[in-house]
Amino acid sequence: VLEPAWRPAGRSLAGRWPAGWRGPHRQPGPAGSTRPVGAGTEARRGLAAWPLEVFAVDDTSVQLTWRASPPAGLRLEIGDIVTEPLASSKASLLLSLYGRVWAPNSEVYGELATRGPRSGTAPATGARRSAGAHSCLTFLAGPRVLDRRWPAGPGTAVVEGLSPGTTYDIVASAEGVPRFLAGRVTTLLPPPGALLCKLAALSDVHVGEKHFGVLGRLWDSLGLGPGYEPYPVRALRGAFLEAAEWGAQLYVVKGDLTRLATAAELRDAGALLASAPRPVEAVLGNHDNVLGVDMRSLLASYGVNVGWWPWARDVPGARLIFANTAGGDLRHNVGRLPPALGRRIAELAGEVATPALVFLHHPPELRPFPTVYPPGLPHSESMALLEALSAANPSTLISCGHRHRNRRYGYGPLVIAETSSTKDYPGAWAGYKIYEGGVLQTVRRTGRPDVLAWTEATRRAMNGQWGRWSPGRLGDRCFSITWGST
């Protein structure tokens, strides 16, 4: 949990930071103590417009995000890892996702849009020690403007090489600002046993979508220019690349591959999935279900096989189960899981001695009437599935999409996780580490510059409420499960 040491002046705290304020600006002193910063006014003035957030955490790393360009000369210290200064809004260079240097011009953005950021390693330095082979910093700093309609400056930083189950102070300093305690984060404890497999789940791709919003429409002018890809395509390519860098051995796309399931959109989605750097499993969502279009044949021509009947894939440490909940009619947002399909999912989960991860598009509905829009599976079908799974294999995690948000809840021994879309705020993908004794989920934002600029803009949807509702809490996004302890 991040515990900020300062309040953005004149800003509401609701939905921005977790509880746990630490009072006025403080600076680390002797071991086990803190002392007030002498230049508290200057620190507040320089950093009030730069809210830092811990978006993701796992057992060995943390992802930090920010909405505005960092102040000049900003350094972050986490444990004994010290970053190079993060680029300010006036920097003449754009640092790509993994530290390569790009000039901020249209040619660069075109290359990033078509091929994605190149990989490399940005060194971490510091007075106490330099980062070793297993401790490195990867960071991203945006240019002043990506899309002229939106203020630029959002960024992400991933700090690796941390110790599991350890609380770290996040210490910041900048030009003219002394070192002070900016926050605190605790890494997760991994499940017992060895790490066996890593996979990534992505949801609600919506290939073919050109605008976002319900109460008002947000348009992506960058994606409409020559040589640029639309934001759903950029977002999925960026997520694929970053998940592969993270170590994912398999991608699972949890439905809504397209916007309207036209033949052209299905072909574009199939080609996009076929170009992924790792194998792909996919299920269909309500946006993929259109009468008169043979979606399965179209996707199969690109090597993407989806079936109406549930199927399984065994990986080290777990059985992965996939089922389509798109239903057999054209009612928008409606999910269906007939009893026969629910029983088949439970049979697949109970056939093996390993735990199971079930991937659906629509989440189970735990109440008789939907309390959240869009609705998930019908309540009766949800209860039948959950009861059957609880009896067949209590060590089961159900991962869903559809609602474009991050939430975690349970039913008996089962854990249910909803994860957000790749293409709207927060613009993220979910990583799953499968251990001998459990599974660890972490949801990270995609940091590719032309993706981050768009997803930051979409947080303004629904009169600004989307940015508060969609990301969920840190505990909804990142958690560790030990089988038999839930």
PLM features: residue spans?
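Surface-exposed, short loops/turns at beta-strand junctions within beta-sandwich domains
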Residues: 159-166
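N-terminal active-site segment of His-dependent metallophosphoesterases
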Residues: 49-50, 56, 63, 70, ...
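Acidic/histidine-rich helix-loop elements
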Residues: 90-102, 203-234, 290-305, 328-337, ...
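A short C-terminal boundary segment appended to hydrolase-like catalytic domains
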Residues: 436-486
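Extended active-site neighborhood of metal-dependent phosphoesterases/phosphodiesterases
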Residues: 173-174, 184-191, 267-347, 384-385, ...
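Beta-strand-turn-beta hairpins that frame and shape the catalytic cleft
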Residues: 189-200, 208-214, 312-322, 351-356, ...
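His/acidic metal-ligating clusters that form di-metal
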Residues: 63-65, 72, 84, 239-250, ...
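Active-site environment of divalent metal-dependent phosphoester hydrolases
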Residues: 208-211, 259-264, 286-293, 328-332, ...
